[in-house]
């Protein structure tokens, strides 16, 4: 694929199988793709396991459930190697080229690290919803006046049949 050899391990592959294959194949990069929400936690686990095993292979994160914020806040902090969010499969070749280039890698990795740090700071500074006390909520509760409410009468009560309606026309 674009002069890169890709080893596709399939779907729902365990962390051990991924890392064993990466070591056996002497992978230059490890790519994870998450299509369902539980994949997010598994990606974080893989990054922490790579750290525990002292691996330094760049980790590429992609897939429908992933995001730059999740990668920067949850995945990258668990791995001291390079972790890069790849928003679209079409960008994987460019990311791989940057990470495998002796002349581009250092600046590219520094740029990613600076961006992720900024994302983490912004994420940490976000305030949660401001909450009010139960007493204040009860004091400002909606007071319905059902005695003086007159519901609007629907224009049709019952059922309406549409005969000779061709559903293929729509």
Question: Where do the model's predicted regions map?
Answer:
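Short helix-loop-beta junction
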Residues: 1-7
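A structural micro-motif
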Residues: 4, 57, 81-82
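Cofactor-cradling patches in redox/metallo enzymes
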Residues: 8-77
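Generic alpha-helical structural element
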Residues: 35, 85, 168-169
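Metal-dependent DNA phosphodiester-chemistry modules and their immediately adjacent helices/loops
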Residues: 65, 70-105
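Active-site loops and adjacent core secondary-structure elements that bind or stabilize anionic groups
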Residues: 90-170
């Amino acid at each position: 694929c674009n002069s890169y050899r890709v080893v596709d391990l399939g779907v729902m592959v365990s962390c051990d199988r991924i890392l064993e294959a990466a070591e056996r194949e002497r992978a230059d990069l490890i790519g994870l793709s998450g299509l369902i929400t539980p994949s997010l936690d598994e990606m974080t686990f893989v990054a922490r396991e790579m750290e525990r095993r002292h691996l330094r292979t760049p980790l590429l994160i992609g897939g429908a459930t992933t995001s730059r914020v999740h990668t920067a806040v949850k995945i990258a902090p668990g791995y001291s190697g390079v972790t890069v969010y790849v928003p679209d499969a079409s960008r994987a070749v460019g990311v791989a080229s940057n990470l495998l280039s002796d002349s581009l890698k250092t600046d590219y990795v520094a740029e990613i690290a600076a961006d992720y740090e900024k994302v983490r700071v912004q994420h940490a500074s976000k305030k949660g919803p401001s909450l009010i006390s139960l007493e204040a909520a009860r004091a400002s509760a909606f007071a319905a006046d059902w005695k003086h409410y007159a519901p609007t009468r629907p224009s049709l009560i019952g059922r309406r049949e549409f005969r000779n309606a061709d559903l293929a026309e729509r």
